[in-house]
Amino acid sequence: MSISVCYYLSKMSESTKVQFEKKSVGHNSDDEYDDTVPYNEDDETSEEEVQEYNEDEVIHPGFVLKGTYLLLKKIGSGNNASVWMTYHISNDKFLAMKIQDHLCYNDGCREVTIVNKISEYGKNNPDFFCVQLLDHFYFELSDNIKYVCSIYELYAGSIHFLLEEGKYKYGLPLPVVKTIIKQLLTSLSTLHGKLNIIHSDVKPENILFKGLPDYQKNIIKLFNRSGFREKYAELCSEYPNRHENLEIEDEFMDNLEYIAMDAIKEIRILEECLNTNEELIPDDPDNNEKYYDSTDSEEYDYSDNSDYYDDDEDTGPIKKYNERLQSVDDCQEILDCKEICDLDKEYNFATVLNNRESSSDKREIIDDKYVINCQTALTDFGNSYFFDKRTRNEIQDRRYRAPEVILDLNYTFCCDIWSVACVAYELATGYVLFDPFGEHFLNRDLHHLFLIEKIVGEIPLAMKKKSKRRKFLFDKSRGYHIKNVDEFKSTNLETILMNQYLFSKEEAESFANFLMCGLSIDPATRSNADELLKHPWLNDVN
């Protein structure tokens, strides 16, 4: 056990130690797990039981995992995991390590299983455009606190990072957008068609650029001049037979961590001075998992009248399900009493002109050579599922969430395609297509549905009637119009692209046609990845 872990455990209060012993992370028996990563037995433990636990005191720069992975700098973080720039001591390589939060240990096991399958396919198909798993293991702090660690190539950063600031804040050049989208669709074509995997979290944060940005080069430069390699070689010569004696090996590891901590001192100073280049990746908090039965895996026919829910029927189970999903002010009684909002006057899609030319921010956040000739990889399979094991819970980031998911209808692979279209629009304009924020105290789902119907078109009546959430989302007395929203005029993507983002008519027409193929509200008529790859808008991409 390393010095930092021993120190931390020695400083823990007795009550905290007892809490550690009690803590256990639940698993779902329907999940498929990698046999090499053990999972915990299920047991409910409240958040208060681990409130004294501080992960940063254990997982920190200079920490050595598996005897060979030296953590240099945290380069990404979300609700459920962190990503570290890592030095592989044995192979003398700089890599990326994803460390799953111990509370989501079994989600990490599921992700490893999925990425293992992806990586097996990728060995013989180099143009797959998905991250490849190089190694995985688990780190055990105590019997009940375990981390799943997975190793990947080091990338330059995500597209989200590129769009936040700098010269591409208001969108990327269209040839680059087309290249990225073609690579993304190529990866999804394989995931859906050959590997039976739904990603369910396609967004700019999860699309990585290949390359080595300046801040990573600076970290490597500082590490190289620290003399770690020479000190490590000297340490190994002092302990030639360390693997034959556990006590000697522990002593070796303690000394290794001393020289590792010394090696990253300048990197920590650089990090404190700059305090940049760590991406904060938002995650959706829903973690309760129920799974579709295999009988649900067919494409759903929303026009089948026999399965409509009657608004006058007893819907006890549905009400219970929706009470769990709604916010505190969104019980049906309160929604029915809210005033109808006129959202149309809040949105003038013709007045916000593109700011690309007038922007004074011309910085290259990532070297242009990695952008113009981009090679990308789809990442973060922590929310992914094999198709026949997909969750019943709400999936996808809010901004890229498909209408069938909002309506709580059966979803298929094409929910990922909806997300692709949203991402394509954002890459080309710098703006999120659907970004509901609960206008006029509306539920965000109602605001989201308004934006979808305003821009894309009306949701088919059959889908509205089929929705388990129809009482919360639609007003039957107004012909299943969106609840609490006044009548509004629709617009269209072609008009928005020309008037707001100054696309030429030809560019807008072609791009809007491509987007609408992926934004078909009825998933049965939405294009799949293979069909979109054949769309004329992508014809000029190599």
Curated annotation (Swiss-Prot):
Binding positions (ATP): 75-83, 98
Enzyme Commission designation: 2.7.11.1
Ranges where the Protein kinase domain occurs: 69-538
Active site: residue positions: 201 (proton acceptor)
Region of interest (Disordered), residue spans: 20-49, 278-314
Compositionally biased intervals (Basic and acidic residues): 20-30
Entry-linked SUPFAM superfamilies: Protein kinase-like (PK-like)
Superkingdom of this protein's organism: Viruses
Pfam family of the protein (one): Pkinase
Family recorded in the similarity comment: Belongs to the protein kinase superfamily. Ser/Thr protein kinase family.
PANTHER family linked to this entry: PROTEIN KINASE DOMAIN-CONTAINING PROTEIN-RELATED
Protein name: Putative serine/threonine-protein kinase L205
Source organism of this protein record: Acanthamoeba polyphaga mimivirus (APMV)
